[in-house]
Amino acid sequence: MKFAHIADTHIRNLKYHKEYKEVFENLYKKLSIEKVDYIIHCGDIAHTKTQISPEFVELCSDFFKSLADIAPTYIILGNHDGNLRNSSRQDALSPIVKALDHRDLYLLKQSGETHLNDEFTINVLSVFDRENWVKPSVSDR
């Protein structure tokens, strides 16, 4: 079983989009060559959580779709992806994931265990859901 772990992409609203596209294309090629079974992005896809540009939405949408076309992709919110000080505000990624409606794209916003298959479970400790942090099950140690 092969997992690809990605984190801290920090896509900027108006800068470096050409460079992001080049890096992402190389990533897609590498993930395809490696034939990964699951992709997990552990947060901070956005660099600025409260002021999202159309360019960010387009680049992020393409990124998510391309990853999910390669393997089931799980996105965990990072502190840059939502507003920790105002929980009534929506995070930057939910509308994008919802609009894509991709069968292999999952946004994990809450803490807890997520079963990938009969063998593997990931334990999410969300910065947006600290009160529900759990330790892995005894059988998983």
Show where each model-derived region lies.
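N-terminal active-site segment of His-dependent metallophosphoesterases
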Residues: M1-F63, D69, R141
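His/Asp/Glu-rich metal-coordinating catalytic cores
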Residues: Y38, Q51-S61, K65-R141
